[in-house]
């Protein structure tokens, strides 16, 4: 029985100085400090359980998300958890439809990142009270209960509530076997850890060599800053991994539409499976034009990590603008909105390959994609989940990768809880790590 009245909501600005090592660097984000607005929900329940929620940021600006979380707090405080999850669609709409706050959205930007952090904490607490990892909580729900968590506003022209229920009902066949498959073998992953744009060749070679030894067969390279440098780096990686392994490329929104087509035509010799975020995440028709132009070269378009909401995904699918759909556990409105996108992707038969990495993104999105395989898509064809090998040591329940696959979490919750000492030391600007760095910069 889900219970307890929310008695406290706190939010922390947690930042890791990843820019010092070039980790996470790409053509648009050259010096990111991987960060998070970290939400903690407490209730008056005797079990003492807490819910932890995250939304991912790149350093500066995290304080703005923290402000937005605090602005949403009145919609959460003193609410009964059982009533929240009993009408989760209504609660989602309450958060996203505040008559004043929605003006700085609606359902996009900073206020939506804050919504994700709050809702992620609610889902974590719900799963903990049920004693299940989040993926299992979702898998065990009947179709009608799952669908009741989704706000279908603005997407009923593509997916109705009844259609969503029918998709889930049809996927009941073979669920038990697929769950056993996940528990035994895990969900296939690819690595982005080897080829950040800021890495020198020596680092790239070393990390690529280590990844091959560890059994990785799918690799992603950052591109978009300099064509000749991209050609050199892609040739280096392709030569190292060989012709049979899978290579993807990611431009992180660097190009205009004609530039994307021209650039990728020149990189086609390296046989990339996809080009990720070739242009503005808001340009649906631009993505469609790029997708059409690159199809004869065998290159698909992948996007989604900075798509604001389910409506953008709806239009990308309608316009046939992408071959691979990339959900993000913190950009959309938490599990609720991601459920709607997974179901739309199933209807359009587009594979979902989630965005991960960051602070806690791997920990969160593993639950969604494992659920997707068991209860929605029922397929691993052309599907894989991103993995980045850093910052997991700061989480109480870090991801487990075995033979280049995500192994299903067994601990109750959404895997969002960070270690207290890590939060304390990396809190900005008063944590020990930042006091030292800011002091050194001041000198």
From Swiss-Prot:
Pfam families per the UniProt record, alphabetical: MR_MLE_C (PF13378), MR_MLE_N (PF02746)
EC number annotated for this UniProt entry: 4.2.1.68
Binding site residues for Mg(2+): 250, 276, 305
GO CC list: mitochondrion
One MF term in the entry's GO annotations: isomerase activity
Post-translational modification: Could be sumoylated.
Active-site annotation: 222, 355
Binding locations of substrate: 24-26, 34, 220, 252, 276, 305, 355-357, 386
Catalytic activity from the UniProt record: L-fuconate = 2-dehydro-3-deoxy-L-fuconate + H2O
The UniProt record lists the keyword Phosphoprotein: yes
Domain of life: Eukaryota
InterPro entries for this protein: Enolase-like_C_sf, Enolase-like_N, Enolase_C-like, L-fuconate_dehydratase, Mandel_Rmase/mucon_lact_enz_CS, Mandelate_racemase_C, Mandelate_racemase_N_dom, RHMD-like
Localization terms from the record: Mitochondrion
A Gene Ontology biological process term: amino acid catabolic process
Sites of Phosphoserine modification: 148
CDD domains, sorted: rTSbeta_L-fuconate_dehydratase
UniProt KW RNA-binding keyword: no
Keywords per UniProt: Isomerase, Lyase, Magnesium, Metal-binding, Mitochondrion, Phosphoprotein, Ubl conjugation
Family classification: Belongs to the mandelate racemase/muconate lactonizing enzyme family. ENOSF1 subfamily.
Function: Plays a role in the catabolism of L-fucose, a sugar that is part of the carbohydrates that are attached to cellular glycoproteins. Catalyzes the dehydration of L-fuconate to 2-keto-3-deoxy-L-fuconate by the abstraction of the 2-proton to generate an enediolate intermediate that is stabilized by the magnesium ion. May down-regulate thymidylate synthase activity, possibly already at the RNA level, by promoting the degradation of TYMS mRNA via an antisense RNA-based mechanism.
Name of the molecule in the record: Mitochondrial enolase superfamily member 1
Organism this protein belongs to: Bos taurus
Taxonomic path: Eukaryota, Metazoa, Chordata, Craniata, Vertebrata
């Amino acid at each position: 029985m889900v219970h307890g009245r929310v008695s406290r909501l706190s939010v922390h600005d947690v930042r890791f100085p990843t820019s010092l090592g070039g980790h996470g660097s790409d053509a648009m984000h050259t010096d990111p400090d991987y960060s998070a607005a970290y939400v903690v929900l407490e209730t008056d329940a005797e079990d003492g359980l807490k819910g932890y929620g995250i939304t991912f940021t790149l350093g500066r600006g995290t304080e703005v998300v923290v402000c937005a979380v605090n602005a949403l707090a009145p919609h959460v405080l003193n609410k009964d958890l059982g009533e929240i999850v009993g009408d989760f669609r209504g609660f989602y709409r309450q958060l996203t439809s505040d008559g004043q706050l929605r003006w700085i959205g609606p359902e996009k930007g900073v206020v939506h990142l804050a919504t994700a952090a709050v809702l992620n904490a609610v889902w974590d607490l719900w799963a903990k009270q049920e004693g299940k990892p989040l993926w299992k909580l979702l898998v065990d729900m009947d179709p009608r209960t799952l669908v009741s968590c989704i706000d279908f506003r603005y997407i009923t022209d593509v997916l109705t509530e009844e259609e969503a229920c029918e998709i889930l009902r049809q996927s009941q066949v073979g669920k038990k076997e697929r769950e056993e498959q996940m528990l035994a073998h895990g969900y296939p992953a690819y690595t982005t850890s080897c080829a950040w744009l800021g890495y020198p060749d020596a680092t790239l070679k070393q990390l690529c060599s280590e990844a091959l030894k560890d059994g990785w067969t799918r690799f992603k390279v950052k591109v978009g800053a300099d064509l000749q440098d991209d050609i050199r780096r892609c040739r280096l990686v392709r030569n190292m991994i060989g012709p049979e392994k899978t290579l993807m490329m990611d431009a992180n929104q660097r190009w205009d539409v004609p530039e994307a087509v021209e650039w990728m035509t020149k990189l086609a010799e390296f046989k990339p499976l996809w080009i990720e975020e070739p242009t503005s995440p808001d340009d649906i028709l631009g993505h469609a034009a790029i997708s059409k132009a690159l199809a004869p070269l065998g290159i698909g378009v992948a996007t989604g990590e900075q798509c604001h909401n389910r409506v953008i995904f709806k239009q990308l699918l309608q316009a046939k603008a992408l071959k691979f759909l990339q959900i993000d556990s913190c950009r959309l409105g938490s599990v609720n909105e991601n459920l709607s996108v997974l179901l739309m992707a199933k209807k359009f038969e587009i594979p979902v390959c989630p965005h991960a990495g960051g602070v806690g993104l791997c920990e969160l999105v593993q639950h969604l994609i494992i659920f997707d395989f068991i209860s929605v898509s029922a397929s691993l064809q052309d599907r894989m989940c991103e993995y980045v090998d850093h910052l997991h040591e700061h989480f109480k329940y870090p991801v487990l990768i075995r033979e280049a696959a995500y192994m299903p979490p067994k601990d109750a919750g959404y895997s969002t809880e960070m270690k207290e000492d890590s939060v304390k030391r990396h809190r900005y600007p008063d944590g020990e790590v930042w006091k030292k760095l800011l002091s050194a910069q001041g000198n």
